[in-house]
A protein has these predicted regions:
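N-terminal lobe of the biotin/lipoate ligase/transferase fold
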Residues: 1-90, 106-108, 115-116, 254-255
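Long, positively charged amphipathic alpha-helical accessory segments at protein N-termini or as interdomain linkers
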Residues: 65-67, 74-92, 102-255
Length: 255
């Protein structure tokens, strides 16, 4: 399984929305990217504000069946982490399930969505959108009310906006996804689990998490299992968390 088409868009409302609109045009796996996204959407309905050329927005569309499609965001976080290490030498941490942090601030957001397509919408696919903050100034995060956000430039990385977006998009395509999708499609998250755990900032920390009934639980995050669930040790036993918001003590102002 490999990405057979990459489309560059000078500007679009949202790469995820564009991919959904054009999903039937793509082959089994395709990607779209832009530096100018004007109507993005974050995880849990949060907005992702356009950075006017100072960020990279990249979406991969997959029609092929996956062993564990719900864990694609975790694979994506590893793919981005590797590319940022290669380009800038930074060591990002992953806040479960897929936020990438640098020095405790959010650098990358990832949003995956399921897609129905084809005759009577019987086809099933998945897309994964990635937003990487490259060179926004502090004033951008202040104006957007994103006190816990940051960019590579703010963290001291030497960002070249003329070349870096295309380099990162190519790297995500060739090395982030192409080299891993076959294994992921066949075996799911398990082959990537140890690498993910080594980068996961949740582990060993106190967390609070949403329960299915709308209440909250709390405990120590002790593992990420083979299905990508966060394992939390609570006073009443272990909880395996897969959906909802998880707050980590000491991160994003959580206490």
């Amino acid at each position: 399984m490999s990405i057979n088409e990459v489309r560059y868009l000078p500007e679009c409302g949202s790469t995820n929305a564009y991919v959904k609109e054009h999903f039937e045009e793509f082959g089994p796996v395709a990607a779209v990217y832009t530096e100018n996204q004007t109507a993005g959407r974050g995880r849990l309905g949060r907005s992702w504000v356009n950075a006017e050329g100072k960020a990279l927005y990249y979406t991969v569309a997959i029609k092929e069946p996956l062993a564990q499609p719900a864990t694609l965001p975790l694979l994506a976080s590893l793919a981005v982490r590797r590319q940022l290490q290669l380009r800038y030498g930074v060591d990002c941490q992953i806040k479960w399930p897929n936020d990438l942090l640098l020095n405790g601030k959010k650098l990358v957001g990832i949003l995956c969505e399921s897609v129905s397509y084809g005759y009577q919408q019987q086809g099933r696919g998945i897309l994964c959108g990635i937003g990487i903050n490259l060179a926004q100034p502090q004033s951008y995060f202040d104006a957007a009310d994103l006190p816990h956000g940051t960019s590579l430039a703010l963290q001291g990385a030497a960002v070249d906006l003329a070349t870096d977006p295309a380099w990162l998009a190519e790297g995500l395509t060739d090395f982030g996804f192409d080299r891993n999708l076959y294994t992921f499609a066949r075996d799911g998250f398990a082959p990537f689990r140890e690498e993910y755990k080594a980068a996961c900032i949740n582990l060993g920390r106190r967390v609070t998490f949403d329960l299915p009934d709308g209440s909250q639980g709390a405990g120590e995050a002790v593992d990420v299992d083979a299905e990508g669930r966060l394992v939390v040790r609570t006073d009443t036993g272990e909880q395996h968390v897969f959906t909802g918001e998880v707050s980590v003590h000491g991160i994003y102002g959580a206490v």
